[in-house]
């Protein structure tokens, strides 16, 4: 029988034994020691012919298998039969194989987990400072008059009304995109040239709809990628501060 051997596929003698057991469709608890020993020796001989280095672990396992096989072949006295029942070398080998199989399955599981999550990037947890005391609403509204609140409410309502779609009917034709990232990049660049620095909210407040806001934001990302501008944000959800690179440098 021709054997195709790759020693790298076996991480030790127990790995080779498990391969032979699977190949012969044997129960690990009912190993046919004669067949396994012969095939194991065949593997080692094939490795020699291929000039592969055979480690001492493989040779020790071969010697163990031959010893077990010889004990089955040689005639035994009654005392030896009783001694065999007490200390069966095959049982000891099977016990080690079972343990090795458990560790191999665990190693394969961990390897697959590494492959699955090797390209996954997780966000580090944020450290949220404990609030020592609750904010007092009176302090928050201390310098705000009723007129200020009314003006703020009117401003919010105006922003809300400007974004409502008043057209209840669907158009027969969908118009092509009127907003292009390249145009918005030029527009932002011109604004920065004049002002050197500006808040992102000042730009998007001029947008007429959500699509224009999205295109404007993508244009901002492209300018950052090209290193034409720098952006800063003091905290999460705060306004984005835009600054021209040349103004910094």
Curated annotation (Swiss-Prot):
| Cystine pairings recorded for this chain | none
Coiled-coil regions listed: none
- Any Pfam family matching the protein: SMC_ScpA
InterPro entries, from UniProt? ScpA, ScpA-like_C
- Keyword set includes Cell cycle: yes
Q: Name one GO biological process term.
A: DNA replication
Q: Does the keyword Cell division apply?
A: yes
Tell me the domain of life. Answer: Bacteria
A single Gene Ontology CC annotation of this entry is: cytoplasm
Q: Which UniProt keywords apply?
A: Cell cycle, Cell division, Chromosome partition, Cytoplasm
Location in or out of the cell: Cytoplasm
Query: Assembly and interactions?
Result: Component of a cohesin-like complex composed of ScpA, ScpB and the Smc homodimer, in which ScpA and ScpB bind to the head domain of Smc. The presence of the three proteins is required for the association of the complex with DNA.
Q: Which PANTHER family match?
A: SEGREGATION AND CONDENSATION PROTEIN A
Spell out the family assignment given in the record's similarity comment: Belongs to the ScpA family.
Instruction: Sum up the protein's function in the record's words.
Output: Participates in chromosomal partition during cell division. May act via the formation of a condensin-like complex containing Smc and ScpB that pull DNA away from mid-cell into both cell halves.
Protein name, as recorded: Segregation and condensation protein A
Q: Which organism is it from?
A: Clostridium acetobutylicum (strain ATCC 824 / DSM 792 / JCM 1419 / IAM 19013 / LMG 5710 / NBRC 13948 / NRRL B-527 / VKM B-1787 / 2291 / W)
Instruction: Give the gene that encodes this protein.
Output: scpA
